[in-house]
Amino acid sequence: MNFQAADWIVLVITLLGVIAFGIYKSSTSRNLEGYFLSNRQMPWWMVLLSIMGTQASAITFLTAPGQAYTDGMRFVQYYFGLPLAMIVLAITFVPLFHRLKLFTAYEFLEQRFDGKTRMLTSFLFLLSRGLSTGISVFAPSLVLHSMLGWDIYWTNIFMGGLLIIYTVTGGAKAVAYTQQLQFVIIYIAMFIAAYYAVQSLPEGVGFTDALHIAGKSGKLNVITTGQTELGFDWKDRYNIWSGLIGGFFLALSYFGTDQSQVGRYLTAKDEKQSRVSLLMNGLVKVPLQFLILLIGCLLFAYYSFFKAPAFFNQAQEQQVLASTYATEYREETAAFTQLQSRKKELATALSSALK
């Protein structure tokens, strides 16, 4: 894929605009509380967007639709325990954190136990968050590497450097505002992609037909019990029980002890605002995740009629074609093209049968 002038303009304006807006909005962060907690003046809706923006990244844009494309909608069950966890946190953790005027979740452990406990948990958080952030930075870097052919190492440094600029200079408020913008940009882009996928379907094939094709292919399996003829399948990762139980405890730990989330709702004006932001997060996250996964199902329907690339990373594909594996790769690509043609025939026949 070659970037046109319009693509470059959108990319540069988005990157510079997000950074400049975040730094501008952080001008009031003149003290420690302002830097880390935005002076505890955020309204609930802004905290909500910040919480959801923390969860939304290039990983969301790339992996969630891909998950539905390959495995269907059942991944949404993973979030069924989230609303229950938000209720528990709103009743227990939020009042405690606000009453003690904490800066971090780990500060409570120091007051309850000792400084060593706080240091250990803080270290574990920084280690896990460092690994997670590295993956989140790598994802957009991989996209730019694929589309533009940039060196992946320098692309990672470039993307990470931009994050460091507004995070270090602006503090919590800069992060909150930039995450809100990123959240809006990511989800608008995803729904534009879904609209484009439906509009690009063959003539006579619409949104309903795309859902039928995805459904007949087993992609709209929203609720699964894990039950088979031989009993319960313990190897089934995504079902209603793993979603309710596992999702509940995972959300409880993530939103209750992970500073990347705790630090968001501690910026709220008061305890009530924090509670509302968490409860609203539990309310809107499940349907929003449902829509994100639905995009993957629409992409599955789209690629049932049109040829999907055998290898999406064009930069690495050129490396393969220039290597000793070029002949083998061309043979595999030819076989893949034949499968795509057969898949299109079956999708067309199915679409006609559903009329």
Label each PLM-derived region with a short phrase.
Residues 1-61, 167-170, 189, 193:
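Membrane-interface "cap" regions at the ends of multi-pass membrane proteins
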Residues 2-3, 40, 63-77, 184-355:
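Loop-to-helix junctions at membrane interfaces in multi-pass transport proteins
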Residues 7-14, 46, 121, 159, ...:
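Hydrophobic alpha-helical transmembrane segments of polytopic
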Residues 18, 52-53, 73-170, 225-233, ...:
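Helix-loop-helix module between adjacent transmembrane segments
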Residues 19, 23, 87, 91, ...:
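Membrane-embedded alpha-helical segments of multi-pass transporters/permeases
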Residues 24-42, 63-81, 88-117, 263-277:
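Flexible loop linkers connecting adjacent transmembrane helices
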Residues 29, 58-61, 90, 94, ...:
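Alpha-helical transmembrane segments of polytopic integral membrane proteins
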